[in-house]
Regions:
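Short coil/turn segments at secondary-structure boundaries
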Residues: 62-69, 95, 99
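Residue-level detector of alpha-helix boundaries and kinks
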Residues: 3, 34, 92-93, 161
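Alpha-helical transmembrane segments of multi-pass inner-membrane proteins
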Residues: 7-16, 20-23, 41-53, 74-86, ...
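Interfacial helix-loop-helix linkers and transmembrane-helix boundary segments
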Residues: 60-66, 91, 114-121
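N-terminal membrane topogenic signal
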Residues: 1-13, 67-69
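Short, hydrophobic transmembrane alpha-helix segments
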Residues: 23-37, 56-62
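Juxtamembrane membrane-water interface segments of multi-pass membrane proteins
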Residues: 59-65, 182-187
Length: 229
């Protein structure tokens, strides 16, 4: 019973966290950016509380084993802390947010270590959000929906095409990886195909070269790992 309750709580918090791109109810003047940030911070706080409570109630619980990938968030944080201009301290809130994202990385690693069954569900939900964003952007390009910026037609649920294109760029390799793993045409297959197809159509209109490069490199890496496997 306790395991089912824990699984349910982790599922709910993970679903809310992955829904962050759509957080923005207009309650703040800068809701498109601020409310998304607050949403992620709030879910991270709840996730931290649940994880710490689980470790406190069960001290013998096995922690997630470290891999070489887990060194990257700490290395990135260290690089940012060393290069940050403390004399003028321009964006302290972003420095704090980056630190919170590093904590969130290790929280998610522990959650997926305890409940590996959630990996498939979170992956599918993440791809579904990418598909929704791609359809949203396509509707904006066709003039069927309003954009969130007066100078850009394509923004999705974001404020401008930059973060929107970046979000599509991180959903594409995940969708490709799941698509390549499918041995038959099932729901994950069609969901991944839909995400890839719509994102490829919309992404060039974002005019984000960094997103294009990210898509090419990440998808090539995923395909190379698939072929080597």
């Amino acid at each position: 019973m306790k395991e089912l309750l824990k699984l349910g709580v982790y599922t709910l918090l993970g679903t809310l966290l992955l829904s962050a791109p759509f957080a923005g109810l207009g309650m703040l003047s800068t809701h498109l950016v601020t409310e998304k940030t607050f949403w992620i911070q709030l879910i991270t706080l709840f996730l931290s509380a649940v994880s710490l409570q689980g470790l406190w109630l069960n001290p013998s619980k096995e922690l997630c084993p470290w891999t070489y990938v887990d060194i990257l968030p700490l290395s990135l944080l260290g690089l940012i802390l060393l290069s940050y201009p403390y004399s003028i301290h321009p964006e302290p809130e972003k420095l704090l947010f980056i630190g919170q994202m590093v904590v969130l990385w290790y929280l998610l690693r522990q959650v997926l270590h305890e409940c590996p069954v959630l990996i498939g569900y979170f992956s599918m939900f993440f791809i579904a959000t990418g598909l929704i964003e791609a359809i949203w952007g396509f509707r904006q390009l066709q003039g069927w929906a309003y954009s969130n910026h007066s100078l850009f037609r394509l923004t999705g649920s974001f404020f401008n095409p930059g973060p929107y294109s970046g979000y599509l760029a991180i959903t594409l390799p995940v969708a490709l990886g799941i698509l390549l793993e499918q041995s038959k045409r099932n729901m994950p297959y069609y969901l991944s195909m839909g995400c890839i197809g719509t994102a490829i159509v919309v992404l060039p209109a974002g005019m984000s070269r960094s997103a294009w490069i990210a898509v090419v490199v990440s998808c090539a890496w995923v395909y190379a790992l698939y072929r080597l496997d």
